[in-house]
């Protein structure tokens, strides 16, 4: 079970918790990511409406995502809320927790290769990477995308060498794909050739950039679709802006007209493409 590097959660943090004991006035929960720590959820923090029977909402052994609303390390008190967690926040936290579980499994593989126990791995790798990146899997993604050298100075070369083949084999790089459409007309006998040449040049130039993939597809005159895949949304937007500027310039110089129509973005993951 993945655990945080810090001893206590912070106020406002979302945590994965397991219901331990239920009482008429509230419930005690163990914090999965903070071994040995328990939190209390008053019945007024269970649901936004009046709760007659807390057991209609919570069951012993149930795992939930809760929000930390108060922390007193001196007294060891942690107050939790369920009603202050919306569906989007719950989904994001569970995704983060799954990423931590995957990072833990990968680190265990590396520890086994080196003949070290997980406590040593947690201390020598997990703690420094979490402190630097906020989550360990984000560090692994950075290494997968930009090379293992990004971890130098954070963990030892011994760990870097052990993790390298594991990260290459198992870590996926998140990418964002955005799509848009161009409406292009060039009222000349060779108008189609002018449009085709403009699109090919823009595509080939963009594809020379690292981790960028641009595809055009014909949607039926005068519409042309573009799909841009990049490491993040901002880079995809930057590429689209550059391509649009180039296409609009070329088409205008040829005496035609071009209009960019925005569409949507999609997030996907791809396996690392070598190191």
UniProtKB/Swiss-Prot annotation:
Q: Name one GO biological process term.
A: translational initiation
Query: Is this entry keyworded Protein biosynthesis?
Result: yes
Give the Gene Ontology MF terms in alphabetical order: ribosome binding; RNA binding; translation initiation factor activity
Q: Cross-referenced PROSITE patterns, in alphabetical order?
A: S1
So which domain of life are we looking at?
Archaea
- Where the record annotates domain S1 motif, the positions are 12-83
Stated family: Belongs to the eIF-2-alpha family.
Tell me what this protein is called: Translation initiation factor 2 subunit alpha
Q: Which organism is it from?
A: Thermococcus kodakarensis (strain ATCC BAA-918 / JCM 12380 / KOD1) (Pyrococcus kodakaraensis (strain KOD1))
Its lineage reads:
Archaea, Methanobacteriati, Methanobacteriota, Thermococci, Thermococcales
């Amino acid at each position: 079970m993945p655990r945080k590097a810090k001893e206590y959660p912070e106020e406002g943090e979302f945590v994965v918790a397991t219901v331990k004991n239920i009482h008429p006035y509230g419930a005690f929960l163990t914090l999965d990511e903070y071994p040995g720590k328990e939190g209390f959820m008053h019945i007024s923090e269970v649901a936004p409406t009046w709760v007659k029977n807390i057991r209609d909402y919570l069951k012993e052994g149930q795992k939930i995502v809760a929000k930390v609303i108060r922390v007193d390390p001196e007294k060891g008190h942690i107050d939790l809320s369920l009603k202050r967690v919306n569906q989007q926040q719950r989904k994001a936290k569970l995704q983060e927790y799954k990423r931590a579980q995957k990072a833990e499994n990968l680190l265990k593989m590396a520890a086994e290769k080196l003949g070290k126990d997980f406590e040593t791995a947690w201390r020598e790798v997990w703690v420094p990477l979490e402190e630097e990146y906020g989550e360990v899997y984000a560090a692994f993604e950075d290494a997968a995308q930009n090379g293992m050298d990004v971890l130098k100075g954070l963990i030892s070369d011994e760990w870097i060498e052990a993790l390298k083949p594991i990260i290459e084999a198992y870590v996926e790089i998140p990418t964002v794909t955005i799509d848009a459409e161009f409406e292009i007309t060039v009222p000349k006998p060779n108008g189609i050739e002018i449009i085709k040449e403009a699109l090919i040049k823009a595509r080939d130039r963009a594809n020379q950039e690292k981790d960028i993939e641009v595809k055009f597809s014909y949607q039926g005159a005068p519409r042309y679709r573009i799909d841009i895949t990049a490491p993040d949304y901002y880079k995809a937007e930057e590429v689209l802006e550059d391509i649009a500027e180039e296409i609009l310039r070329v088409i205008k110089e040829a005496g035609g007209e071009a209009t960019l129509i925005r569409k949507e973005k999609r997030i996907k993951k791809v396996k690392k493409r070598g190191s």
